[in-house]
Amino acid sequence: MDDFRKYATKHLGMNGMVLDDVIKSQAGYLNPYILEERQLNVTQLDVFSRLMMDRIIFLGTQVDDYTANTLQAQLLYLDSVDPGKDISIYINSPGGSVYAGLGIYDTMQFISSDVATICTGMAASMAAVLLVAGAEGKRSALPHSRVMIHQPMGGAQGQASDIEITAREIQKLKKELYTIIADHSHTDFDKVWADSDRDYWMTAQEAKEYGMIDEVLIKK
């Protein structure tokens, strides 16, 4: 830690007192924080917030209402501060709520900035829909990533009429999701329907051939 302090103060010109306070507060922990000294002050950010300053967003959890609200807010904010400049979403997610995911999808289509999507591990279910929904020519995956599409799942209980209502809604969602995948991947709707009847797994290369992505990233 002494070597780090010497390097930071002598070679980077960072303020020693401020640096000591930060080191003391982080003692015993290894948190993903970035420490930057600017002309007037020192700013500490978690690594994800720092990356967002470079217009990089992460979807690394299950898609739920909280995740969707956060991603939509990030997309809207970045589009407002620099309209039309690309935004990148790195995806490693098993999917989740269809309704929450469709909120993210609609926001991606609504903003003026192109949204590049990159699969870094797995894009399954609703996450696969978001992957393919990126700007055409700007969708990619790392070599050992996996992409999976399937039909939406749901359950119902209660009176028969309530079960029928839920079943009709699931069928509507099914058609919506398959239409989104077919339109963005330029794959025949009937093929998407048939393939999604059960879990349909694809390697990165297979996802490219299917039209889910445009490129398999080998090296930056």
UniProtKB/Swiss-Prot annotation:
Predominantly, its location class is: cytoplasm
Name the family. Belongs to the peptidase S14 family.
**Catalytic residue positions:** 125, 150
Going by the UniProt record, its keywords in alphabetical order are: Cytoplasm, Hydrolase, Protease, Serine protease
User: Among the record's GO biological process terms, what is one?
Assistant: protein quality control for misfolded or incompletely synthesized proteins
**InterPro entries given in the database record:** ClpP (IPR001907), ClpP/crotonase-like_dom_sf (IPR029045), ClpP/TepA (IPR023562), ClpP_His_AS (IPR033135)
Q: Does the keyword Zinc apply?
A: no
Q: Which Pfam families does UniProt cross-reference here?
A: CLP_protease
EC number of the protein? 3.4.21.92
UniProt xrefs under CDD domains: S14_ClpP_2
**Domain of life of the organism in this record?**
Bacteria
Q: Which gene encodes it?
A: clpP
Q: Which reaction does it catalyse?
A: Hydrolysis of proteins to small peptides in the presence of ATP and magnesium. alpha-casein is the usual test substrate. In the absence of ATP, only oligopeptides shorter than five residues are hydrolyzed (such as succinyl-Leu-Tyr-|-NHMec, and Leu-Tyr-Leu-|-Tyr-Trp, in which cleavage of the -Tyr-|-Leu- and -Tyr-|-Trp bonds also occurs)
Q: What class of enzyme is it?
A: hydrolase
Q: Please describe what this protein does.
A: Cleaves peptides in various proteins in a process that requires ATP hydrolysis. Has a chymotrypsin-like activity. Plays a major role in the degradation of misfolded proteins.
Entry annotated with the keyword Hydrolase: yes
How this chain assembles, per its entry, is: Fourteen ClpP subunits assemble into 2 heptameric rings which stack back to back to give a disk-like structure with a central cavity, resembling the structure of eukaryotic proteasomes.
Q: What is this protein called?
A: ATP-dependent Clp protease proteolytic subunit
* MF (Gene Ontology): ATP-dependent peptidase activity; ATPase binding; serine-type endopeptidase activity
Classification from the root reads: Bacteria, Pseudomonadati, Bacteroidota, Bacteroidia, Bacteroidales
One GO CC term of this entry? Answer: cytoplasm
- Subcellular location, in the record's words? Cytoplasm
